[in-house]
């Protein structure tokens, strides 16, 4: 068969969706692939609450402003936290936090438990400030230290731009809650400049052995944004990283679009080493909370089946053990839980009292959480792997990988199954 006929056969082949990622891998090998997303599996964890504050992860930082049954004076995010403290006090408090929230021993324990990667969220303000920003800087020193620890303990890293100016989603984990100004003014261009800074430093040869992906932006709220403008941002962000010399994977988060939505975007041959990041949760609506455990597991299994069909390599960049939204401030400071009927006009499903502390979990709930975790692990093994959210939390056990492993709820080793073959893969 001559080359022209071969190319035509490939173009119209029904197996193209599977052959293209392989071609992508071959091209990457020639460019110096530092992670094989086609065959290797990420077993990773997020280091959330470190360089971008999240009240539900470290409520102790915010509790100084809390009163019994009154959160009205509590800052809702890092923007308002630093604004309330002022630059000098915020610098002092956050330096101590950056220095202590994750330490070298955490990385050592991650390796011990069988993890091979970490995803590190960080905000734009760590690299460049807007004139009016109350944020403080100093995070980069600790990010560099984290990369040294990751290298020492053979952990690969995704650097995840978790917050953009104006906020890309209005979530507290973007740094600025209840705002959606990412696509306004010069904010997109400013974000691209930040990505260029990240790419020039962490996409270079010094970090090729440890940084295997740079995420352009975490969880842009696609249903509320101009998706065409977002696609332009992704394209330019990709180009900025490649122009900086980076060969690492360029990660795009799915923007809350259905699986498969990005199949015809950033495709070969013009774009290479692109990975789609999916975040999977089932607790942020009343409809999800009312599902039976069997329904939860069916949904989780379908994530795996759907991921197998996608054009791009894909990874579950966030997921958790949560079957409730009972963790304090999970939905935001000043907001209750849907599960207990205290938020979002949700019906009452039950009291949160017994779900906050793992020691008081009903035995059936403990079993259900284990089943749910195992089903998700099975599903994400059909993809490029996973990053659990989060490595640790002060009081939110359903989101605390270290605590779940210690309690025997999360499989250890990860292939250990009490409920095998729930998905039938």
Swiss-Prot record:
GO terms for molecular function: glucan exo-1,3-beta-glucosidase activity. The keyword Secreted applies. Its main location: secreted. The keyword Zinc-finger does not apply. The active site is at 219 (proton donor), 318 (nucleophile). Its EC number is 3.2.1.58. It is found in: Secreted. Disulfide bonds join 301-423, 326-352. It comes from the Eukaryota. It catalyses: Successive hydrolysis of beta-D-glucose units from the non-reducing ends of (1->3)-beta-D-glucans, releasing alpha-glucose. GO terms for cellular component: cell surface; extracellular region. Residues 1-19 form the signal peptide. GO terms for biological process: cell wall organization; glucan catabolic process. Beta-glucanases participate in the metabolism of beta-glucan, the main structural component of the cell wall. It could also function biosynthetically as a transglycosylase. Belongs to the glycosyl hydrolase 5 (cellulase A) family. This is Glucan 1,3-beta-glucosidase.
